[in-house]
Amino acid sequence: MTRLTLALDAMGGDFGPCVTVPAALQALASNPALNLLLVGDPAAITPLLAKVDSDLLSRLEVVPAESVIASDARPSQAIRASRGTSMRIALELIKDGRAQACVSAGNTGALMGLAKLLIKPLEGIERPALVSVLPHQQHGKTVVLDLGANVECDSTMLVQFAVMGSVMAEEVLELTNPRVALLNIGEEESKGLSTIREAAAQLKETPSINYIGYLEGNDLLTGKTDVMVCDGFVGNVTLKTVEGVVRMFLSLLKSPASGPEQKQKRSWWLKWLGRLLQKRLSKRFGHLNPDQYNGACLLGLRGTVIKSHGAANQRAFAVAIEQAMQTVRRQLPERIAARLEAVLPKSD
């Protein structure tokens, strides 16, 4: 099996090394061909490795970093002051050829800006997009982009996102001729902003894209499309809403449906039935847990960069690491570049 080396921004996110280091060890234990470069403050990382098996330690290296980019820092300021930070060093490891991908739970805007600066976009791509794969009710998955990298998008960018999303659906989900839709406020052709209508017209004229038209937000998890395209503002709000609803739903399955007084009045068999239903429903809908699809790929770069949710726990960050491995092994940047060369005009 081909060995992979990934760089992890160990200091990024809400919890830093307390989450990233255990997640890294979990990924190493599950993947014997994986090597990891943990970028961050050795004083914060090393104590968490004290009782780790020697085999795992042999595939792990701590790369020192002087500082960390704050999650609330303005991207422009963070980029100017980024030298010596864990995020920048992790990205530089890709640029220098020491790592094949980077995973960070840090500041999204800073990660986007530094990735464009250091890794560079693919030929024909104006701006990379954050993309994730979400489960739907038909027991399949849908590629969704942009999830927050670009708040404002013109029609050309939306078409580029559609091309990249289509390639990802083919390579990661192994779909043939994946369906592509634009997220809009209605399915009628006259609905939506001018940029969306212009993108729709261009997609209709792109033979390599199986464009099926507009879909609304309530269609996101129905399985009506394999790729859903939108600007970063709409995508981020949509993703956070879906995650919030799913977490609420799963928490309701695990908690009593009635108050303390009603709970005391229930007979033993009703209590038993309630626990049984909670267990079965939790198992039935557990695949919707946002932790299981954490990690958005910054698609459109010459290398692989994965953005983990800032509030990710150990399990979720480990999923982001797995996604980075899958993206590298599928050679996604190279395959997107080949498709772009065939269907999009080169930028001047």
Curated annotation (Swiss-Prot):
EC number annotated for this UniProt entry: 2.3.1.274
One annotated GO molecular function: phosphate:acyl-[acyl carrier protein] acyltransferase activity
Enzyme class label: transferase
Cellular component aspect of the GO annotation: cytoplasm
GO BP annotations, alphabetical order: fatty acid biosynthetic process; phospholipid biosynthetic process
Main location: cytoplasm
One Pfam short name: FA_synthesis
Reaction(s) catalysed (UniProt annotation): a fatty acyl-[ACP] + phosphate = an acyl phosphate + holo-[ACP]
InterPro entries: FA_synthesis, Phospholipid_synth_PlsX-like
Lipid biosynthesis in keyword set: yes
Intracellular or extracellular location(s): Cytoplasm
Record's keyword terms, sorted: Cytoplasm, Lipid biosynthesis, Lipid metabolism, Phospholipid biosynthesis, Phospholipid metabolism, Transferase
Pathway(s) it belongs to: Lipid metabolism; phospholipid metabolism
Biological function: Catalyzes the reversible formation of acyl-phosphate (acyl-PO(4)) from acyl-[acyl-carrier-protein] (acyl-ACP). This enzyme utilizes acyl-ACP as fatty acyl donor, but not acyl-CoA.
Family (UniProt): Belongs to the PlsX family.
PANTHER family assigned: FATTY ACID/PHOSPHOLIPID SYNTHESIS PROTEIN PLSX, PHOSPHATE ACYLTRANSFERASE
Subunit structure: Homodimer. Probably interacts with PlsY.
Protein's UniProt name: Phosphate acyltransferase
Organism: Pectobacterium atrosepticum (strain SCRI 1043 / ATCC BAA-672)
Gene it is expressed from: plsX
